[in-house]
């Protein structure tokens, strides 16, 4: 009889839980909140006129302790200009199979071309898809930006880009 009462007491917890509203996450349909300072996926940023901030210096690759970043630089020409400097990152890859999310690459970047955004959905069933290329890492073009390659904003120099002196305004006036 005593064991039967213990059994009923145990089932009482089970039965009370059966009729409560389930506490589940509706994750695929409704993503959960992300902390404002959460660092997830990397992003290559652009200047206000659409040129890329990456100058192909490879400092991010040198700073990465996991050797997850590969950068191959090329020279800009006046006919094809991708960044305001003399070079740009022609090939830029981050291997998320190796990345440990330490942020050393962000600290090493002299032009703040590389940042980490709140995107955390990077899972995939194919290992090759976890090596993100430049096209996946570049920030999308905003209104008022032109897709590179294009010349620098009229009347501006490389120094103006790094000081952000009226680049967006000069670019809008040129159109």
Swiss-Prot record:
Q: What class of enzyme is it?
A: translocase
What are the record's GO terms for cellular component? plasma membrane
Instruction: Specify which residues bind [4Fe-4S] cluster 2 according to the UniProt entry for this protein.
Output: 64, 99, 102, 105
> Would the keyword 4Fe-4S turn up in this protein's UniProt record?
yes
Name what cofactor the protein needs.
[4Fe-4S] cluster
Q: Per the database record, which ranges form the 4Fe-4S ferredoxin-type domain?
A: 44-74, 90-119
Q: Which GO terms describe its biological process?
A: aerobic respiration
Cross-referenced InterPro entries: 4Fe4S_Fe-S-bd (IPR017896), 4Fe4S_Fe_S_CS (IPR017900), NADH_quinone_OxRdtase_chainI (IPR010226)
Q: Which Pfam families has this protein been placed in?
A: Fer4_7
Which residues are listed for [4Fe-4S] cluster 1 binding in this entry? Answer: 54, 57, 60, 109
Has UniProt tagged this entry with the keyword rRNA processing? no
Write down the EC number: 7.1.1.-
Q: How does it sit in the membrane?
A: Peripheral membrane protein
**GO terms, molecular function:** 4 iron, 4 sulfur cluster binding; iron ion binding; NADH:ubiquinone reductase (non-electrogenic) activity; quinone binding
Going by the UniProt record, its keywords in alphabetical order are:
4Fe-4S, Cell membrane, Iron, Iron-sulfur, Membrane, Metal-binding, NAD, Quinone, Repeat, Translocase
Membrane-crossing segments per the record: none
Subcellular localization: Cell membrane
Q: Which domain of life is it from?
A: Bacteria
* Cofactor note text: Binds 2 [4Fe-4S] clusters per subunit.
Q: Which reaction equation describes what this protein catalyses?
A: a quinone + NADH + 5 H(+)(in) = a quinol + NAD(+) + 4 H(+)(out)
Described purpose of this protein according to its UniProt entry: NDH-1 shuttles electrons from NADH, via FMN and iron-sulfur (Fe-S) centers, to quinones in the respiratory chain. The immediate electron acceptor for the enzyme in this species is believed to be menaquinone. Couples the redox reaction to proton translocation (for every two electrons transferred, four hydrogen ions are translocated across the cytoplasmic membrane), and thus conserves the redox energy in a proton gradient.
Record-stated family:
Belongs to the complex I 23 kDa subunit family.
Assembly behavior: NDH-1 is composed of 14 different subunits. Subunits NuoA, H, J, K, L, M, N constitute the membrane sector of the complex.
- Its name, as the record gives it, is NADH-quinone oxidoreductase subunit I 1
Which species is the source of this protein? Answer: Mycolicibacterium paratuberculosis (strain ATCC BAA-968 / K-10) (Mycobacterium paratuberculosis)
What gene codes for this chain? Answer: nuoI1
